[in-house]
Amino acid sequence: MSPLKIYGPIRIRSMQTGITKWKEGSFEIVEKDNRVSLLVHYNTGGIPRVFQLSHNIKNVVLRPSGIKQSRLMLTLQDNSFLSIDKVPSKDAEEMRLFLDAVHQNRLHAAMKASQGSGSFGTILGSRTSQKETNRQLSYSDNQASSKRGSLETKDEIPFRKVLGSPGRGPIKTVTGGGMAVTRTIPSLTLTSTPLRSGLLENRTEKRKRMLSGSELTEDYPKENDSSSNNKAMTDPSRKYLTSCREKQLSLKQAEENRTSGLLPLQSSSFYGSRAGSKDYSSGVTNLDRCNVSSQTPSAKRSLGFLPQPTPLSVKKLRCNQDYAGWNRPRVPLSSHQQQLQGFSNLGNTCYMNAILQSLFSLQSFANDLLKQSIPWKKIPFNALIRRFANLLIKKDICNSETKKELLKKVKNAISATAERFSGYVQNDAHEFLSQCLDQLKEDMEKLNKTWKTEPVLGEENLPDTSATKVFTCPVITNLEFEVQHSIICKACGETIPKREQFNDLSIDLPRRKKPLPPRSIQDSLDLFFRAEELEYSCEKCGGKCALVRHKFNRLPRVLILHLKRYSFNVALSLNNKLGQQVIIPRFLTLASHCTESTKPPVTLGWSAPVAISRPLRACQMMNSCITSPSAPSKKFTFKSKSSVTSCLDSDSEDELKRSVVLSQRLCDLPGNEQYQEDVEKDLKLCRLEPGKAELENSGFDRMSEEEVLAAVLEISRREASPVLSPEDDDKPTSSPDTGFAEDDIPEMPENPDAMEIEKSKTITEPGPASFTEITKDCDENKENKTPEGSQGEVDWLQQYDVDREREEQELQQALAQSLQEQEAWEQKEDDDLKRATELSLQEFNNSFLDSLGSDEDSGNEDVFDMEYTEAEAEELKRNAETGALPHSYRLISVVSHIGSTSSSGHYISDVYDIKKQAWFTYNDLEVSKIQEAAVQSDRDRSGYIFFYMHKEIFDELLETEKTSQALSMEVGRAARQAS
């Protein structure tokens, strides 16, 4: 049957990857064993993405996109969204009909009715294989380079098999369940020998596998019985082939010792077997690399020999001379996976990098921050929560330079509130963590207050709208817990409860007794919650002594413990580090510090019901099934003359004509004065409610340019709203995953003069008449018409040249001044960074010998030691490995400090990745894998901050991840079987 494959720009949106950019590629249908899959290939190479279609299609939409072209949009059951644009309308319609058949379970009936016809019956019509061949060959001819073409072929290798017949014939590329494309290539034939994959050749070897003498005698004359070919038997290349037979004999023994599953080498599979042992394991790929046009018409050989061997053709046989990739061994698939990369050190910012890596590893924290549709446009541009979320989203998909800029913005947002973190001085990681969490809570509190006071479009008809204006704070939901302090009078027993909220606990080092083994973090935690006596005046009986007990009133999802390893030295005015060994258990238990009324952690389920129930703008939706790259509301306002001119200045005359017609229609509207007043009102309304315009234009991504213009014109007639440029149609302003706009990354210009220049150029809210004048001026400038007046053409040209020269001089001067200022600023920043780095290295080297710390007692006489019974000690020891006791917490991250003082040294973080189910060490930019046992043993003297997750929450996240991975593997296995 004919293959079903279409080509064009592709964009995919899914829960795992977010939204991708438009990339050239193809959609290919694969059907086998009553299962239908969609393979997405990219021209840039890489592993094809597989999407199961059987019982998985939610919606199929086909829309026009240009002249005789269409855009096909496919929505799956998990709200994954696939789009392919610029597809010929006929091909797109056939694909839509096929997908509809799969959706309605009509595929197999249709295929059974048309079995053996080479088509999909009424679904696909009579598509011949030659037609598909022409389209595929013409498409491959239009590629930018042969490298891209080869990568595209490589991309399709895992799903193709090469079949053929002896002698001259077509090459069939088999795909999926019998779908094939026939390419007729003269003088080239592939036999039915399977691909010899897995045979790797030594890079140092430059020998060629040749045929044995008997095989050559049997096959070669039969394929070459013309006079020209018989003459070629005596030319120099014949001698070359003879000499190669001896080499073949030396390789014969090695060939016999290879895997028994591989078939013996045959004459016509010379290149096929060689390609199987190189980077490109497909015969089709090797054919693409052969220069077919250079062969003589009389050549009738099989693929094993080049026609009319000459020194030039012999040179071409040695492919390694032209392309080094032929000699390169096949790289394992695992090496193609993206290398993990941490955060760059901006200059003594290792404390920030370590804390950010530990926080970002908390999957529930990240979900609460990104998946509750926070209205980011209502949050100030430099707010920490906005910078924080932006870095969290892009840390795994952007390059190191972009990541460095995002880190600077996070640091600036912190420094704006806490000046001690400005500059490049080493700071305490725990202080940074506390400041970060407090600032995130403040930002969320401000957002909720703003959200309650401002009216939201579309909520007038919703019941109980006040309850829909609350967003969950990720810090409160995941990290905050509540402790109840009960003050009990020892005289009368009067109890006074007091509650206190914490984001983390600062616990003391437990005192170590020489004969006993080192204490653990469990001991320090129990030490914190021990009952203690204090002086307290009882209001009831006047007693002066009371007992204080501490119990958890509400548990967190993640418990952060700060181990106080520093003691202040009064003489030196320094915080000396205590290197006492503290055992790091895998599990902690809070059972002895909880009561029957203790509330468990907030259950998973990131979607706050009140926040999700509200009507969301498309730019805020994480899992929306419709992409909405509508322009920001600021683009709905009338722009300055210069900006409109630049917008209309295009090489396309049709676009200019459409703009002129649009402006004339606006001028023809009745009541220009009333129209101007309405425009001013709408502009003010857009400033107050920027989301309104976005809601009205959320569907522009699906429309063509003509439809967008018509829609905007209709809106302007009905509501007197400003006009949206059609050029903004295909420029997404936000990601459907998070709602962040693309302009979140660049900063505002720091030069105030540049901002003043922009303000001076802006014409405030011109009416339709002025818009028409601007368009006409643009038209005149584009046509280079001479203005009417008393001056002649020569005078006007001279004046034009003078003005142009003056403008160029002013532009050059401004550019030179800007470059000088930029260079001076960069030089100053580099000098500061260099000095800070040198200072950090010097302090680190001085304190490195002291980094191991002292194994002596903490020396804190005020700290009591915890005493356990033998049974309690044994139970705690077992729980440290199993987590069997109630309210157990599992270790998921450790922030360690290497050094002797808090103002020097270096911070690193060890993080457990739930998705990869492995531990990783983040040392600024370097990331390495580490075993959990190594974390527990290597950080017992340097561990500073510990993150423990509630065992039930951890198990639920881990089970969810395992289920997701198993499902992905099942889909991949089904796709491989279908191929």
From Swiss-Prot:
Keywords: Cell cycle, Cell division, Chromosome, Hydrolase, Mitosis, Nucleus, Phosphoprotein, Protease, Repeat, Thiol protease, Ubl conjugation, Ubl conjugation pathway. The active site is at 350 (nucleophile), 906 (proton acceptor). Residues 704-723, 806-825, 828-847 form the UIM domain. It catalyses: Thiol-dependent hydrolysis of ester, thioester, amide, peptide and isopeptide bonds formed by the C-terminal Gly of ubiquitin (a 76-residue protein attached to proteins as an intracellular targeting signal). One of its GO terms (cellular component) is chromosome. It is an enzyme of class 3 (hydrolase). This is Ubiquitin carboxyl-terminal hydrolase 37. It comes from Mus musculus.
